[in-house]
């Protein structure tokens, strides 16, 4: 549940196409090989640093809930050592309101990124024109699924999370084994991980002080801000489901499962589409340059797979499951902000 709650459908959207956004960037050209750096930066931006945002806070919140026995799951409660009794008054309420607004902004950002892709996939499968009504229909279906899981409590969320993982790994396995780029995916993936390990600190501290390309401002800082917005929800949820686990188990479990799933997604889906470009089987950059549309570019990538309609069905089902699971965790956290005091589990 850590993985599915911490990431919405954005991971599938960006896994296919993030390297495309980097490929023609002047900063990538400065660094050398487009192939290696375009596959390295996605796992850097979605890798150890952002997951550490979640896990460090999850440990703190889990300690507050399960060891200290705190019955208030709010950011204002975490500020009580500083605010004192004012955590229950206007300053504390202001902090909780800011957290809720940040949560709504993060949710809106997530919907705006991946929902148009689902609408185009559905349009492609059914022949219906891609319109706002198709998008609304997708949102309604997603809301029905996550509401059904939510009313069944943690058991419902757990089952939905398991279904999400089955769909997710089925998609990855099919692309890896049936796409015809298995060797390239594996070799480029290992190269990207090694390149990240070798250059991790230089990537993390590069600020482009002369603004020659503004790459870190455009991408790296944007991603850190994007992940920090979700820190108002995901760490609380991870902390709440980590009852009975040690600090070591929470952190290592989060890194092994969540970071592992993230890396697999980018290294398989991203390197598959990159392999198509490098081998000349599909001019991915040309399609994106001509259309200026990542959504149609992703569909063109999926069309190169055997049984492409089946893959599109699997893709949209996995994205809906990711959305529903993520929003279940958000709903639980948002509702906890509204309680004066929580009782029971």
Please identify what each model-predicted range represents.
Residues 126-151, 170, 224-236, 345:
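Transmembrane alpha-helical segments of multi-pass small-molecule transport proteins
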Residues 14-26, 175-195, 199, 259-293:
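Extracellular/periplasmic helix-exit of transmembrane alpha-helices
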Residues 1, 20-41, 64-90, 276-306, ...:
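Flexible loop linkers connecting adjacent transmembrane helices
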Residues 95-99, 103, 109, 151-178, ...:
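Membrane-interface loop-to-helix entry segments
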Residues 74-90, 148-168, 185, 222, ...:
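Hydrophobic, small-residue-rich membrane helices and short re-entrant helix-turn-helix hairpins
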Residues 1, 39-46, 60-71, 120-125, ...:
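Membrane-water interface regions at transmembrane-helix termini and the short interhelical loops
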